Design a protein with these regions (language model features):
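A residue-level marker of the well-folded mature domains of exported/periplasmic proteins
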Residues: 2-7, 12, 21-133
């Protein structure tokens, strides 16, 4: 749970840097909905958001584990005007163009778990390593 809270705190700090003190909307994008790992990450993110206050976590993802489905979700989040996107990518390269579009619009982008190619994110957080798995 501490890793999940640290993760959301890092994303929130990125989203808050240079912005007014209003509610920060952070999208937590899973590889697919219904996966226990991502559901647990959402629980931790929601708890951390509650502790921080003025942070809204939007947990979302596709119903299938395809890059195309994830890109559709990302386009919707850009249209909503979220402040930050934290994504576990289904394809590290395919999501880069849409995430570049997000960053051009001022949205902070963090990849976690399964990374995004460097051009499509500002930081990557690896919540574990092979020795711990």
């Amino acid at each position: 749970m501490k890793i999940k809270a640290s993760f959301i705190l890092t994303v929130a700090a990125l989203a808050l840097s240079g912005s007014a003190l209003a509610e920060v909307k952070i999208a937590l994008v899973a590889k697919s909905l219904g996966n226990g790992f991502f559901e647990a990450a959402n629980v931790g993110a929601q708890e951390a958001a509650k502790e921080l206050g003025d942070v809204k976590v939007i947990y979302t993802g596709p119903t299938t584990t395809t890059a195309e489905a994830q890109i559709e979700v990302l386009n919707g989040l850009i249209a909503q005007g979220v402040d930050a996107i934290a994504i576990s990518a289904n394809d590290p390269d395919a999501v880069v163009p849409v995430l570049k579009k997000a960053m051009q619009r001022g949205i902070k982008v963090v990849s976690w778990d399964s990374g995004v190619a460097a051009g499509g994110r500002q930081i990557h957080l690896n919540p574990s390593n092979n020795q711990l798995i």
